């Protein structure tokens, strides 16, 4: 089983090579690193080239944005599973791919190889570098989970069949990965397998969290959920958010008490 770790970069400075070196440290797993660079001029790509590692393949081509860059990266990937790791983000430890392979192999042994009619997503939780805590995700993907909190993009391994019918839609500037995830699990019959251990160290603080992007993200979320959830599901999700005090929970999950809050979330998920 081979993994393609796809990284899209543009003048990323030292973050690119830091991410690459972290990926290269993975143990007991077959993988390649596909770097799709948008014609950087800061020398960041040259530092990676200097590593002279055969597991790294670099493609330099202009793109229209990060999701277009990811689509280009997919076209150069030869792995059985794709993982998208942004510059500055890292795997949680050096055995993430080993655990992903074990989880995927367990599914394949029980259910068979992923196909275009039944692709496979393997996912886990993320460690937030900003909050200094693990943000746990639900072990079951339901319409409510799709509405409120899907797995972090960097914490997902997609079987290549997930992209056989269609790629990311770059017209969604902030939530193209969210749209593709909902399409995958709610419309394209994609199976999901949960890995309990954290997958990535998410840096945060990038474009998607800027005030402009947050506003656009909300608009895209509204449009996307209307496409994939029924009116009843949307009503249920909105009522759930109100009854469970979502604004308060959001504040707790990212504030000084984030470690305590996320630990409680982990215990709740384990009991389900």
Question: What is the predicted function of each stretch?
Answer:
Residues 21-30:
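Short, acidic, metal-binding catalytic loop of nucleotide-sugar glycosyltransferases
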Residues 90, 94-135:
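Conserved donor NDP-sugar-binding/catalytic core segment of glycosyltransferases
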Residues 2-4, 32, 179:
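Cell-envelope/extracellular polymer assembly enzymes that use nucleotide-activated donors
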Residues 30-39, 59-62:
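Short beta-strand/loop segment that forms part of the nucleotide-sugar
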Residues 82:
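Short aromatic/hydrophobic "clamp" motif used to bind/position activated sugar donors
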Residues 134-220:
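Conserved nucleotide-sugar donor-binding catalytic segment
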Residues 61-77:
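Glycine-rich, basic loop-to-helix element that forms the pyrophosphate-binding segment
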Residues 37-46, 86:
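A conserved acidic beta->alpha catalytic loop
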């Amino acid at each position: 089983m081979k993994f393609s770790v796809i990284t899209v970069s543009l003048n990323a400075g030292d973050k690119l090579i830091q991410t690459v070196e972290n990926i290269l440290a993975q143990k007991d797993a077959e993988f390649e690193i596909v770097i799709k660079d948008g014609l950087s001029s800061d020398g960041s790509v040259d530092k990676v080239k200097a590593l002279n590692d055969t597991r790294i393949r670099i493609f330099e081509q202009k793109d229209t944005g990060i999701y277009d860059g990811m689509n280009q990266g997919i076209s150069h990937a030869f792995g059985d599973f794709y993982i998208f790791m942004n510059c500055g983000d890292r795997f949680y430890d050096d055995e993430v791919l080993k655990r992903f392979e074990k989880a995927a192999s367990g599914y394949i042994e029980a259910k068979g190889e992923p196909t275009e009619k039944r692709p496979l997503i393997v996912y886990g939780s993320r460690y937030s570098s900003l909050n200094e805590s693990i943000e746990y995700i639900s072990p079951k993907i339901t319409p409510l989970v799709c509405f409120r909190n899907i797995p972090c993009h960097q914490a997902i391994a997609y079987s290549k069949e997930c992209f056989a019918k269609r790629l990311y839609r770059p017209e969604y500037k902030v939530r193209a990965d969210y749209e593709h995830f909902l399409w995958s699990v709610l419309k394209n019959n994609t199976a999901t397998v949960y890995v309990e251990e954290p997958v990535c160290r998410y840096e945060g603080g990038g474009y998607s969290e800027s005030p402009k992007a947050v506003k656009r993200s909300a608009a895209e979320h509204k449009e996307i959920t209307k496409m994939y959830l029924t009116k009843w599901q949307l009503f249920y999700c909105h009522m759930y958010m109100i009854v469970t005090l979502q604004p308060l929970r959001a504040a707790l999950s990212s504030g000084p008490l984030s470690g305590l809050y996320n630990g409680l979330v982990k215990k709740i998920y384990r009991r389900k």
